[in-house]
Amino acid sequence: MVKNKAFFGQIMEERDNPAFFKILRREDHSTEMMRMIPHHLIRSISDKSSSFKMVLRVPWGRSWQVKISKNPNFHYMEDRGWNQFVNDNGLGENEYLTFTHEANMCFNVTIFEADGTEMLRPRKTITSSSGRNKREERKSIYKDVKKEEEIESWSESSHPCHKTAESTSGRLTQKQELNLRKKEADKTEKSKTSKKKKVETVSNDSEAGTSSLIPEFKLTIKKSHLLFLGIPKKFVDMHMPTETTMFKIHYPRGKKSWDVTYVVTDVQSRFSGGWSRLAKELGLLVGDVCTFKLIKPTEMRVKVSKE
């Protein structure tokens, strides 16, 4: 029935009207190849009905107009209209779509979920502005992230002059600065006490002939941590690589592991590529407490406590 096993734009024969299918994957649903329209389908439509636009219509009555362009090799749907269609329907999770040409470049689109269930009505979470809402939500998260980075960068600095913090954030109020100074003073005092206890512990371990403690750090999950995870500066300085490195993070309780890219930056080194997937599959929520233990130079073990 299908000429080859690719995931995009293949012609479907053995039916009255020309049709093709696509499987939408998150990583490539907006690429030019994914937006390709099979050459055989274009040829099967008469010149009178073809145009530089097509209409995508779903079973519950909504439709989207998408412009068509052509490169030296094939015709394809332009990204603006295609992405609007994908975003409005919340697609990109391995859905199977069939496109059947009815007339005048109007295509009936049938959508099947990854489990094979046909979508006969819009998802409850989807509205006409879902694409815009997602972009606004992501923009809001990044604003929160930037603010957190500015505050953390200032509070972690050992320079006594607060002008550095002012030039970094530019928006911190006097009250926030006073609070940060107080927190920094408390942090310094706790750090001295912690270092003293650590020296005593390591000393006792040495006397007892045991190995040194496994390096670890603990973080309470914030909103930004669902996208990427900033590593505490002191832990970075003492234990982490000085260049971008691939880490493997293990979750012994679920017997799972993930490959995550550790990115080194001037502001804050962090787990980036692969981290959001880990956070999603672990079901991390704001307020959860995660403990990370460095078991090998590029491997960590994570423990999650639900608060």
Curated annotation (Swiss-Prot):
<dbReference type="InterPro" id="IPR003340">
    <property type="entry name" value="B3_DNA-bd"/>
</dbReference>
<keyword id="KW-0805">Transcription regulation</keyword>
<keyword id="KW-0804">Transcription</keyword>
<dbReference type="GO" id="GO:0009567">
    <property type="term" value="P:double fertilization forming a zygote and endosperm"/>
</dbReference>
<feature type="region of interest" description="Disordered">
    <location>
        <begin position="151"/>
        <end position="209"/>
    </location>
</feature>
<dbReference type="GO" id="GO:0009553">
    <property type="term" value="P:embryo sac development"/>
</dbReference>
<dbReference type="Pfam" id="PF02362">
    <property type="entry name" value="B3"/>
</dbReference>
<keyword id="KW-0677">Repeat</keyword>
<feature type="DNA-binding region" description="TF-B3 1">
    <location>
        <begin position="20"/>
        <end position="115"/>
    </location>
</feature>
<feature type="compositionally biased region" description="Polar residues">
    <location>
        <begin position="166"/>
        <end position="177"/>
    </location>
</feature>
<dbReference type="GO" id="GO:0046982">
    <property type="term" value="F:protein heterodimerization activity"/>
</dbReference>
<dbReference type="GO" id="GO:0003677">
    <property type="term" value="F:DNA binding"/>
</dbReference>
<dbReference type="GO" id="GO:0005634">
    <property type="term" value="C:nucleus"/>
</dbReference>
<dbReference type="InterPro" id="IPR015300">
    <property type="entry name" value="DNA-bd_pseudobarrel_sf"/>
</dbReference>
<protein>
    <recommendedName>
        <fullName>B3 domain-containing protein At5g18000</fullName>
    </recommendedName>
</protein>
<dbReference type="InterPro" id="IPR044837">
    <property type="entry name" value="REM16-like"/>
</dbReference>
<feature type="compositionally biased region" description="Basic and acidic residues">
    <location>
        <begin position="178"/>
        <end position="192"/>
    </location>
</feature>
<keyword id="KW-0238">DNA-binding</keyword>
<feature type="DNA-binding region" description="TF-B3 2">
    <location>
        <begin position="214"/>
        <end position="307"/>
    </location>
</feature>
<feature type="region of interest" description="Disordered">
    <location>
        <begin position="122"/>
        <end position="141"/>
    </location>
</feature>
<keyword id="KW-0539">Nucleus</keyword>
<dbReference type="GO" id="GO:0010198">
    <property type="term" value="P:synergid death"/>
</dbReference>
